[in-house]
């Protein structure tokens, strides 16, 4: 016969030619000993097995070796069982043909020189066609041996393994799935709990016999609600069975293995490589994962920081949102500035506030700056409780009270001003003033940046507008005032009456604790945020004028100088424009500097005052770091800087902000999309199985020879299509598992960082044990991800090669005219058409008419 069966038989003969003990006379008994399968595998992949070591008498081992190698290495699912091959003297012809056709699909395109090019083309183009393609005119004679009658004769014959081990129902060829030497319906081999497709080596026996459970349960991948129809139906009602199976068919098809083994059968795979999965909203097992991937990927370090930060901006400023997230919880309840109790972001002098979406690390101006501005503007620095006649603590007063002095009380009656340095456990404040503990929390103190670094920046001077309220440090009110001045960011140029030195001094005397207030430097506001934001609080101007008057008084000047080391003039650092935090707490120094100059009683202070104000404003608009000090103040600033010379604080060690990194592959597929595509594949597989059962019945029931050839072509094509769908389904399951591993890796890494963030001296034995466990788990996760990635890459490579071979075949001279339309479709041309074409060719080309007989 010149049909597909003859072509397949001829191809097998050519592949096994020259191998001892292998004689291909038909597509049934000739394959019983398993040597023919091994010979085909060895010819194309001699590295997979040692043919010379095989014995013709060892039927079971030969077949077992061939089936296992084909499944694991080539992704060809085993439709046959070694025990059946041993028990039957004449194996089922249709089963052999179906199984060998997959070898043909896989190898024909890349077959040895012995295989003709036309054959190769056919092979790749369609699994069914493979049978017909290989046969040469001379080969057809032998192909006839397997007459159509053989199939019908075997129609009633059922192999011993045709019963499903799970549901005890008959299993048709198109439904077969072999696992651990047992036969199952494809839809029966699924996880009992989550109904997802079982992957090779990733399942264990369930509580009941014949059931299986995933090694690791994932969000349900199988089609929703379909798992219930698990039991197979009796073979007789094929349609019913298929329908039921269709519903049941979740994904437990042999494909998982095939995928792992890298199925290369048909080029079709290439389009599937990573097709866009139908976006079908299903069970969003990990919605967060899906949503976050885009953002997390781009951000190098702070990918996941945003998650943790749930900013609640007290006073939304243009940029406060960013800082809020970054801010660490402030000591005082009110101290919690916009920022959440988030780990301090790495200070970045300038960043675009847009990063706020990624709250993790404010890239713009130091988040502390924004935060400070937002809150401090509204709330003046709290005056020392004793002397401050200003508004009650609860009251936020930006306006200057008592002669223009900013006396607004702290937000709350909190006596402790938030000390950013103190809050940062790890980093001692580089604050210029050695303030003992946080005094009444100045509103701005709350915004203290998360990290001591932040407090360190002298640039903040423009920032502290509200601070103008004199804090009477024990050293001198002037110092307090100066520090305030440096920090204070003149809300407005409104010249409020200079603070009277008396008021200052009285306040200073009354408030010894004010020193502390002074010490907590206000977080410098980023230049990007205009100082203008703060309503023109006369406090700043008042403080400036106060400074001048104080400086004239002279007595205060010295104390301020003493403090100078701590408070190196903020101007100097600003002039440097250093992006990093300037020397510790030089901000306070700004005020002192003018004071020192004033000490000479020169009127410079007042000009200085105005200039600082202007500078402050400008600095708000521009980056404070780049701001240049006013000429009058610069000398003193320089001196102060030299004197205090606060060293830049070292990068935070244990206090480094913890960011949950999102581990994600480049091609992320939302979980809902994976579920949707798997549902679609399941429906297609159900339909194919339904057709396959009916087709198998017809083939076994007996049909005329001409009709049988057409049916065989359809059969091979159907088997191949099923194989491709199963492969894609398996790939999706691997992708889903990979994404779960990625999520788990992110969690483990974050937990490990949290552990390592703790000073080693504070570690307990439990911490050390936990570290080892986490490290081991991390290594395991990475290895598992690597294995899946390698497997998927191999599959993709093989599919690309198949596509290339298919294209080459289509262009072959012999098929150019006939297959030109198909060639345009690349892998999508009709298999049946090509097979028929080949059959006609064979008739016209045959050199020996006698070959047919």
Curated annotation (Swiss-Prot):
Motif (NPF1): 419-421
Region of interest: Mediates the interaction with RAB13 and RAB35 and intramolecular interaction with the CH domain: 642-853
Gene3D superfamilies (alphabetical): Calponin-like domain, Cysteine Rich Protein
Coiled-coil regions listed: 671-701, 791-820
Modification type Phosphothreonine: residues: 312, 315, 457, 459
Compositionally biased spans, kind Basic and acidic residues: 355-366
Region (Disordered) residue spans: 118-162, 224-659
Positions of short motif NPF2: 623-625
Record PTM Phosphoserine, positions in chain: 292, 306, 388, 460-461, 474, 476, 568, 611, 730
Quaternary state and interactors: Homooligomer. Interacts (via NPF1 motif) with EHD1 (via EH domain); the interaction is direct and probably recruits EHD1 to membranes. Interacts with EHD3 (via EH domain). Interacts with RAB35 (GTP-bound form); the interaction is direct and probably recruits MICALL1 to membranes. Interacts with ACAP2; the interaction is indirect through RAB35. Interacts with RAB8A (GTP-bound form); regulates RAB8A association with recycling endosomes. Interacts with RAB13 (GTP-bound form). Interacts with ARF6 (GTP-bound form). Interacts with PACSIN2 (via the SH3 domain). Interacts with DPYSL2.
Protein known as: MICAL-like protein 1
Record gene name: MICALL1
């Amino acid at each position: 016969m010149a049909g597909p069966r003859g072509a397949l038989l001829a191809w097998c003969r050519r592949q096994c030619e020259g191998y001892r003990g292998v004689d291909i006379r038909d597509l049934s008994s000739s394959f019983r000993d398993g040597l023919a399968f091994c010979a085909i595998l060895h010819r194309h992949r001699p590295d997979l097995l040692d043919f010379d070591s095989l014995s013709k008498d060892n039927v079971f081992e030969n077949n077992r070796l061939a089936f296992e190698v084909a499944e694991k290495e080539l992704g060809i699912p085993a439709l046959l069982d070694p025990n059946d091959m041993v028990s039957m003297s004449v194996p089922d012809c249709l089963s052999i043909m179906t199984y060998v056709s997959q070898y043909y699909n896989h190898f024909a395109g890349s077959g040895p020189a012995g295989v003709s090019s036309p054959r190769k083309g056919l092979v790749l183009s369609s699994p069914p066609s493979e049978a017909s393609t290989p046969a040469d005119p001379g080969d057809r004679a032998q192909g006839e041996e397997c007459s159509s009658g053989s199939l019908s004769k075997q129609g009633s014959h059922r192999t011993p393994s045709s019963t499903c081990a799970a549901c005890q129902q008959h299993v048709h060829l198109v439904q077969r799935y072999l696992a651990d030497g047992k036969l199952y319906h494809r839809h029966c081999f699924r996880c009992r709990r989550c109904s997802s497709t079982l992957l090779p080596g990733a399942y264990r026996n369930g509580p009941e016999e014949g059931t299986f459970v995933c090694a690791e349960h994932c969000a349900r991948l199988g089609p929703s609600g379909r798992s219930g129809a698990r039991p197979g139906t009796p073979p007789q009602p094929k349609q019913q069975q298929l329908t039921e199976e269709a519903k049941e068919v979740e994904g437990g098809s042999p494909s998982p293995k095939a995928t792992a083994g890298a199925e290369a059968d048909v080029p079709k795979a290439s389009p599937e490589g990573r097709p866009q999965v139908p976006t079908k909203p299903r069970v969003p097992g990990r919605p967060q994962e899906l949503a976050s991937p885009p953002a997390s990927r781009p951000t190098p370090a702070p990918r996941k920081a945003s998650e943790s930060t749930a900013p609640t901006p007290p006073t939304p400023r243009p940029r406060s949102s960013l800082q809020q997230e970054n801010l660490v919880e402030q000591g005082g309840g009110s101290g919690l500035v916009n920022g959440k109790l988030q780990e301090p972001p790495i200070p970045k002098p300038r960043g675009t506030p847009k990063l706020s979406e990624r709250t993790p690390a404010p890239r713009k101006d130091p988040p502390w700056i924004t935060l400070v501005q937002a809150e401090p503007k509204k709330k003046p620095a709290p005056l020392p409780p004793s002397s401050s006649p200003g508004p009650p603590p609860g009251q936020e007063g930006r306006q200057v009270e008592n002669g223009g002095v900013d006396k607004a009380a702290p937000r709350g009656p909190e006596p402790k001003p938030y000390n950013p340095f103190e809050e940062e456990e790890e980093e001692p404040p580089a604050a210029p003033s050695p303030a003992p503990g946080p005094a009444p929390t100045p509103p701005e103190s709350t915004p203290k940046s998360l990290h001591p670094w932040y407090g360190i920046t002298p640039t903040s001077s423009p920032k502290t507008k509200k601070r103008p309220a004199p804090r009477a440090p024990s050293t001198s009110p002037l110092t307090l005032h100066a520090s305030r001045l440096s920090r204070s960011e003149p809300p407005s140029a409104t010249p409020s009456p200079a603070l009277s030195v008396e008021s200052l001094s009285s306040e200073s005397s009354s408030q010894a604790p004010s020193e502390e207030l002074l010490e907590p430097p206000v977080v410098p506001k980023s230049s990007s945020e205009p100082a203008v934001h703060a309503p023109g609080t006369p406090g700043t101007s008042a403080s400036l004028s106060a400074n001048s008057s104080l400086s004239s008084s002279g007595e205060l000047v010295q104390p301020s100088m003493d403090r100078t080391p701590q408070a190196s003039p903020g101007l100097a650092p600003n002039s440097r424009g250093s992006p990093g935090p300037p020397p510790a707490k030089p901000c306070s120094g700004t005020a002192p500097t003018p004071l020192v100059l004033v000490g000479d009683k020169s009127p410079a202070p007042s000009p200085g005052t105005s200039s600082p104000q202007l500078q402050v404003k400008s600095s708000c608009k521009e980056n404070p770091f780049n701001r240049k000090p006013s000429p009058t103040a610069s000398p003193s600033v320089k001196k102060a800087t030299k004197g205090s010379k606060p060293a830049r604080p070292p990068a935070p060690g244990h206090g480094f902000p913890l960011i949950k990194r999102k581990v994600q592959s480049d091609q992320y597929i939302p979980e809902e999309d994976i579920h949707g595509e798997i549902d679609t594949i399941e429906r297609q597989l159900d339909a194919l199985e339904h057709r396959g059962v009916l087709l198998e019945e017809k083939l076994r029931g007996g049909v005329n020879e001409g009709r049988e050839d057409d049916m065989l072509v359809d059969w091979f094509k159907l088997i191949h299509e099923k194989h491709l769908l199963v492969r894609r389904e398996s790939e999706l399951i691997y992708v889903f598992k990979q994404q779960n591993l990625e999520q788990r890796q992110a969690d483990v890494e974050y937990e490990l960082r949290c552990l390592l963030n703790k000073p080693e001296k504070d570690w307990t034995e439990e911490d050390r044990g936990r570290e080892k466990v986490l490290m081991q788990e991390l290594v395991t996760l990475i290895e598992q991800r690597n294995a899946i990635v390698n497997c998927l890459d191999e599959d993709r490579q093989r599919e690309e090669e198949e596509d290339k071979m298919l294209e080459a075949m289509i262009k072959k001279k012999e098929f150019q005219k006939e297959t030109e339309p198909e060639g345009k479709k690349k892998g999508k041309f009709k298999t049946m058409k090509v097979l028929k074409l080949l059959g006609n060719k064979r008739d016209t080309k045959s050199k020996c008419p006698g070959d047919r007989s």
